[in-house]
């Protein structure tokens, strides 16, 4: 990773400029062009160094969310995971080595909508979701220290 990419990640991993043209503002701060910032972000994402650019919302204030899991027979896991991914309310899902082997996060406007989606998933898959709503959030600093240059 080159110096500009490191500086870009180090400076903006905890917040983007809140303005009409955030990438232009980032470019001005970093001393490069807006096109260069956008290209770096695309490259970092393609290389797997960056998973996404976007807000981190406090979902408990913006609506409702829950962590859910399904115990999926191994031979159905791929099909069920693909189906779960099609729900707009599903942020992401992942496989685990456990009886409950497919985990996913659901977000919705309110708890009633979450319950409807969980019921739909149960009807759709024939599997009963384990619903694990958050009780309390313990926030941690997710920033990673990055050297300016090597």
From Swiss-Prot:
Q: Does the keyword Lyase feature in the UniProt annotation? A: yes
Q: In which pathway does it act?
A: Porphyrin-containing compound metabolism
Name the Gene Ontology molecular function terms of this record: lyase activity
Catalysed reaction, written as an equation? siroheme + 2 H(+) = 12,18-didecarboxysiroheme + 2 CO2
Q: What does gene deletion cause? A: The nirDLGH mutant lacks dissimilatory nitrite reductase (NIR) activity. The NIR activity is restored by adding purified heme d1.
Does this entry carry the keyword Lyase?
yes
State the EC number(s).
4.1.1.111
Highest rank taxon of the organism: Bacteria
Enumerate the UniProt keywords alphabetically.
Answer: Lyase
Gene3D superfamilies for this protein: 3.30.70.3460, Winged helix-like DNA-binding domain superfamily/Winged helix DNA-binding domain
Class of the enzyme per the UniProt entry, highest EC level: lyase
> Into which family does the record put it?
Belongs to the Ahb/Nir family.
- Function of the molecule: Involved in heme d1 biosynthesis. Catalyzes the decarboxylation of siroheme into didecarboxysiroheme.
Please give the subunit comment from the record. Answer: Probably forms a complex composed of NirD, NirL, NirG and NirH. All proteins are required for the total conversion of siroheme to didecarboxysiroheme.
Protein name stated in the entry: Siroheme decarboxylase NirD subunit
Which gene name belongs to this protein?
nirD
